[in-house]
Amino acid sequence: MKLRYLNILKEKLGREPTFVELQAFSVMWSEHCGYSHTKKYIRRLPKTGFEGNAGVVNLDDYYSVAFKIESHNHPSAIEPYNGAATGVGGIIRDVLAMGARPTAIFDSLHMSRIIDGIIEGIADYGNSIGVPTVGGELRISSLYAHNPLVNVLAAGVVRNDMLVDSKASRPGQVIVIFGGATGRDGIHGASFASEDLTGDKATKLSIQVGDPFAEKMLIEAFLEMVEEGLVEGAQDLGAGGVLSATSELVAKGNLGAIVHLDRVPLREPDMEPWEILISESQERMAVVTSPQKASRILEIARKHLLFGDVVAEVIEEPVYRVMYRNDLVMEVPVQLLANAPEEDIVEYTPGKIPEFKRVEFEEVNAREVFEQYDHMVGTDTVVPPGFGAAVMRIKRDGGYSLVTHSRADLALQDTYWGTLIAVLESVRKTLSVGAEPLAITNCVNYGDPDVDPVGLSAMMTALKNACEFSGVPVASGNASLYNTYQGKPIPPTLVVGMLGKVNPQKVAKPKPSKVFAVGWNDFELEREKELWRAIRKLSEEGAFILSSSQLLTRTHVETFREYGLKIEVKLPEVRPAHQMVLVFSERTPVVDVPVKEIGTLSR
């Protein structure tokens, strides 16, 4: 904990904090949990949807999509397999906690080389729980040598009448924790994720260990509880464990809680109370319910071979009281726990758009990664990995699109414009599959905001301005700061996850045709919406469209080959730094933007 934060805590408590309180506040006031540097910026963003563990956006009168992106950067740097695997598990539970069945996973990976453990961790976890990994992006650069970025997006479909809130609503409710048993893994994981990676700061206890088969049981058990009307509120046990989940549930409802740590199911019997409180053991959920429903919840948990118990009561007094075998362990105001100190923000005024140079990341065939993922489990994947946005079908009717996108190569040259272009190019990719953009989730990956607060301000200002320009609001998000090694930061990397609404039956597939480059060589903000109108028009006419920041990659070539097609194009001598839009059509597109024939797609 920062010394300034410690002094604030002493002042608020009116005394010296106890050992247990220091452990608790070091977690809850960490950057990972408390968002001290970004909370004021986040309040400025245009928002949409039902907020909770994940953002929820309506597709129609019957269905909504819950979706969110999160980072597991620090754990994946230390222990690639478990770090990446538990990143998948955690974001799946965030979506699940809204009452949604998880239906899709996307990843955005930035590293200096393909780290097999990270790929295997994502693949093994996603494949084992039966949720398809339908796409993502892979960027290889030495700029991420010591700080790989592992950002994972999950989405799920929920009936509008089955949405679950993320708070307690009245005194007298109880909180049930169920899932895997609690051990010492992941203790102070949230604090570790808020630090520079230099030196020997990470220990085995900082890295969570996942069990995808327990996660699968957890998914089915929780959805059964929701279907029976037993769940009145829910929270994933992620960063901060029991402490974070139970305190957030009551803080959001302006209530309090009495937590009994001796009721938490353990797999290590000699754990200290503070260890039980902040352990980040995986595959656990907290459910708010009525006392009379608790026994049925525990019955369902046992049926699915999961542990569980009633661990807390919701009270009217706004305090967070922790007990262990009838001894008082901690008692503090619940809102003090939930509201970390906030750092002042820096106002940023953008300059003119620069003349970007192409910063080539190492080209890789991402199909070598995609092929480790099961993208067809569930049989709802309409557009598979390889071309950008994925399209998912909803069994009743309709569908949604997802895409992840980043432009660290541009943000490295100008943080503001590189970040803004990443959002606007995500709109291009979404429109390219015939979808209408609905909302975004985002992950702000940044270095040290104490050293360079201006860069963070540039990122957050660009995100706000891009959302306002495009009319696509934010539904959820995540910030991962202190991605530094020996004081050297990563490039400012905003990863955008964009959700769109689409009719899967009208999604174009590649077929033999001419290839056209559509749009301008230079990025011009005032003309961007003209390009969007052109993409929308051509998509409605049935053209297959590919938007790519590298024009044509090995991944695209190999993906066309999967369709039995061969692409031949003449690349321009000077390729633009921004994303190009390729239109595949038998005749020259008729649109109000520049069009140039550059090749063919043939059998």
Swiss-Prot record:
Residues that, per the record, bind Mg(2+) 2: D94, D236
InterPro entries linked to this entry: PRibForGlyAmidine_synth_PurL (IPR010074), PurL_C (IPR031652), PurL_C_sf (IPR038411), PurL_linker (IPR041609), PurM-like_C_dom (IPR010918), PurM-like_C_sf (IPR036676), PurM-like_N (IPR016188), PurM-like_N_sf (IPR036921)
Stated consequence of mutating H72A: Strong decrease of the binding affinity and 20-fold decrease of the catalytic efficiency for FGAR. It has no effect on the ATP binding site, however it affects binding of FGAR
Binding residue positions for substrate: S71, H72, N73, H74, R93, G189, Q208, E280, S281, Q282, S480
GO cellular component terms, A-Z: cytoplasm
A GO MF term: phosphoribosylformylglycinamidine synthase activity
Keywords (A to Z) from UniProt: ATP-binding, Cytoplasm, Ligase, Magnesium, Metal-binding, Nucleotide-binding, Purine biosynthesis
Pathway(s) annotated for this protein in UniProt: Purine metabolism; IMP biosynthesis via de novo pathway; 5-amino-1-(5-phospho-D-ribosyl)imidazole from N(2)-formyl-N(1)-(5-phospho-D-ribosyl)glycinamide: step 1/2
Entry's localization field: Cytoplasm
Annotated EC: 6.3.5.3
Active site: H32, H72
Signal peptide: none
Annotated binding of ATP 1, by residue: Y35, K68, N442, G477
Residues annotated as binding ATP 2: D107, G136, E137, L138, R139, G388, K429, S549, H556
Binding site for Mg(2+) 1: E70, N478
Similarity-based family: Belongs to the FGAMS family.
Miscellaneous comment in the UniProt entry for this protein: Purl possesses an auxiliary ATP Binding region which is not catalytic, but able to bind additional ATP. The conformational changes associated with its binding could have a regulatory role in formation of the PurLSQ complex.
Assembly and binders: Monomer. Part of the FGAM synthase complex composed of 1 PurL, 1 PurQ and 2 PurS subunits.
The name this protein goes by in its record: Phosphoribosylformylglycinamidine synthase subunit PurL
Protein's organism: Thermotoga maritima (strain ATCC 43589 / DSM 3109 / JCM 10099 / NBRC 100826 / MSB8)
